[in-house]
Regions:
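Transmembrane helix-boundary elements of multi-pass transport/secretion proteins
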Residues: 2, 6, 17-94, 108, ...
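Pore- or pathway-lining transmembrane helices of multi-pass membrane proteins that form conduits
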Residues: 29-35, 171-194
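Short, membrane-interfacial amphipathic segments enriched in basic
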Residues: 1-15, 206-217
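Hydrophobic transmembrane alpha-helices
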Residues: 71-81, 179-190, 207-209, 213
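Alpha-helical transmembrane segments and their short interhelical loops
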Residues: 107-181, 185, 230
């Protein structure tokens, strides 16, 4: 099969996801409001704290809002990966998935195209969040807006693949919505998104190992150090 056919298929799937995202305005606003609520309310509760140290020997502190911003970026990608997979379950129940499966394009290419389309949408959400987060004085270096892109692609692929795996195992829409919340919140809270690992190690050793082996922690840390060019 010619390469142009694959490219047209990929373009069609990406445009379909982009149009769905544009038409679902509540999805866009919820994707931004959710991390902004965390940033505006949760960070305000820790504003009295001098800061958080993340680089050994843990003597240099940064504001807490600056610390949790990468974790909130990863949260955007986590929710978007799950919601993109939720749309797959919806398409399967409504029967629209059959129109894609009857095409001569291999199914693995359809899945990869769907995954990359979700990553593209999540990156748009992240950059929109970074623009609004500047109101909280979260302004990374100019180079950070470029160096964060590979980290966003890798973490988006990882989190999107997790959601796609769940959507392939769970056939009903209602069951997937429940399992989605069961997966999202433990992954988010048991990571370095809100607290540095060395602080967690001081308070609970078993929780430290849970956070250390949590794949979401590595997504957060890759985003953090690429965003701030460190």
């Amino acid at each position: 099969m010619e390469l142009i056919v694959y490219l047209r298929c990929f373009r069609g799937i990406v445009l379909r996801e982009a149009l769905r995202f544009v038409h679902q305005k509540e999805r866009f606003f919820s994707a931004l409001v959710r991390p902004l609520v965390w940033l505006g309310i949760f960070a305000a509760g820790f504003r009295s704290v001098l800061g958080v140290a993340i680089i050994p020997p843990y003597e240099t502190y940064i504001p807490y809002e600056v610390y949790i911003a990468p974790g909130l970026i990863a949260m955007i990608q986590l929710f978007n990966g799950m919601q993109s997979s939720l749309s797959m379950v919806y398409d399967r129940e409504m029967g629209s998935m059959k129109t894609m499966l009857v095409s001569p394009i291999p199914r693995w290419f359809l899945l990869i195209s769907k995954l990359l389309a979700g990553v593209f949408v999540s990156i748009l959400q992240v950059y929109a969040f970074l623009i609004i987060a500047s109101l909280w004085d979260i302004v990374p270096p100019v180079s950070g807006y470029f160096t964060i892109l590979p980290a966003l692609i890798i973490s988006g692929l990882m989190l999107g693949s997790l959601g796609m795996f769940l959507s392939s195992a769970i056939k009903q829409l209602e069951n997937f919505a429940g399992v989605m919340n069961f997966v999202i919140f433990p992954m988010f809270f048991a990571s370095s998104a809100l607290y540095p690992l060395w602080k967690i190690e001081e308070t609970s050793e078993w929780l430290y190992y849970v956070c250390f082996y949590n794949p979401f922690t590595y997504a957060v840390e890759s985003i953090r150090f690429s965003l701030y060019s460190q």
